[in-house]
Amino acid sequence: MNPSTSPNRNLASPKSLQLYTTGSEVAWYPTALDEANEIKSINSKAFSFKNQDQIYGAGSLKSRFSTHEISSEKNDSPDFTLVLPSNRLYIVIPGLMLSIFLAALDQTVITTAIPTIVANLDGGSSYSWIGTAYSLAETSILPFCGIMSEVVGRKIVLYTSIVLFLFGSAMCGAAQNMLWLVLCRAVQGIGGGGIMSLVTIVIADITPLQTRPYYTGCMGVTWGVASVMGPLIGGAISQNTTWRWIFFINLPTGGLSLALLIFFLNLVPKPTVSFCVFLRDFDFVGIVTITTGVVLFLLGLNIGSTTGHWAHANVLCYLIFGILCIAGFVVNELYTTRTRIIAPSAFQTLSLSSVMVTSFLHYYIMSTVTYYIPIYFQSIKGDGPLMSGVHTLSLAVVSSVVSAISGMGIGKLKNYRYPMIGGWIVLLAGTGSMIAIYYDTPIPRTMGFLALTAVGIGNLFQPNLIAIQASVPPALMATSCSAFMLLRNMGASVGISIGAVIYDQQLTTLLKGTEYSTGLSYSQIASIPSVSERNFVFNVYANAIRTIWIVNCPVAGVGMLLSFFTKQEKLSQSVTEYKEKDKGFKDAP
């Protein structure tokens, strides 16, 4: 296609154009669009989008983040030719995986070291905020990362996230009191959230759809290995040296990752946006409402699940105002004339909406299993923190291996729909089998049930992400990935909190009228003189956790049904290479 003959060629300057290709030609075309107008096809083999009555000024944010039509017809998907920068993937991918490893490691590494940290810093009851601060900051920053990576550039956001993570790690290691540590864990979480979001986006920028599942599979393995090693590394460090090295150990590894990416990561440059245009077009109301809503909602969930006082005024206020802010964000995104944080068109088809919801449900189930199975082993089977980690290895190892195999299978078969459906079927079977875990169930059998569940969990990591990336045009890739990751993290937080409600409610109900409390440890239960009463209490605690698995079954059933609505898109792209080298911070957004 000749740029001079393209529609609207006189309506926008080069700064408001987006790089696309058709066949072997590369050209800049206007991207300013209006949802109210009918679809205008520029080239049926290249791409289609909606026209706009008013074209905004040069470099307009609105022209950068146009709302592309996402077809609901099977064969009408736009065939975008991907412009790939020249990269040494054998260097860049390990650099990205190192950063992912650190962000994932710090979610679990402190679990076995918390008693040591609390004793050293005299933390008392505030210990729970060591983990909460990280997860809260990580989740709340996700909506911001996608849009800012479009405005200021992928590299700036990615490198800033890594630097923030390393700075937070150094300050956590130097913490002299619990408040210091919690605040710096929040800084770590902001960096970790940026890393998770930007690595996902950058991989989509530098790899074509047909090979991308292999690299997202690497992400799954890296995440799984870090999750497995986290408690073991944390326990080993806290027992053999100072707990501060749990955080200091991030510095050399993170520094290596940052150096590799600065010197070797190349991205295709895009038009810049002036600061005045940014202030004019950026959706400040949207970013404030979604960030405030997520923070308040997660605070309510965390405080409620930690204290068990769900009817307390503070908890209810956090939850209610959080939900209202999120609802306000949705309304704002539907009607705002500014650049949207999350484009509604990312949810406009049943297929995309199904993938987003199943991602939430997937992480809901995964979080309940990974959080409450260690409690089962420690409270019912008498495991210490280290041994409970060993007994949950089947969950982590199997899910990581299956995630890698799933990614390779999707890449080879060019199909993500069947692995997604199969994953939900296996996950439903796994959650159903876990209902058979009682207080006297042999540990090998329990590990077998966990392994079956892990097959379903691991098999769903790659199909969901690939389905999103295959279904949206390049202009919506960053914000769609951020929305996807936000829903995943929200699912995990909701899962842990709902699990806490079920667990506490069941213990309170089943122990009502007895002399036993709801906070007994294994040693306290084991010291009950009467064998019948001892077995009764063990059975009550086991049934409280078992109720969580019972609730997981209909959740998995809903996920399985929704997976059938996912549409299979083509996992192939025409690729042309962008020749110019692009180092360091050179690329524009």
From Swiss-Prot:
The keyword tRNA processing does not apply. One of its GO terms (biological process) is transmembrane transport. SUPFAM superfamilies: MFS general substrate transporter (SSF103473). GO terms for molecular function: transmembrane transporter activity. The chain crosses the membrane at residues 90-110, 128-148, 162-182, 189-209, 217-237, 245-265, 284-304, 311-331, 355-375, 390-410, 418-438, 448-468, 483-503, 545-565. It is a multi-pass membrane protein. It is found in: Membrane. Keywords: Membrane, Transmembrane, Transmembrane helix, Transport. One of its GO terms (cellular component) is plasma membrane. CDD domains: MFS_Azr1_MDR_like. Belongs to the major facilitator superfamily. TCR/Tet family. This is Uncharacterized MFS-type transporter C1399.02. The lineage of its organism: Eukaryota, Fungi, Dikarya, Ascomycota, Taphrinomycotina.
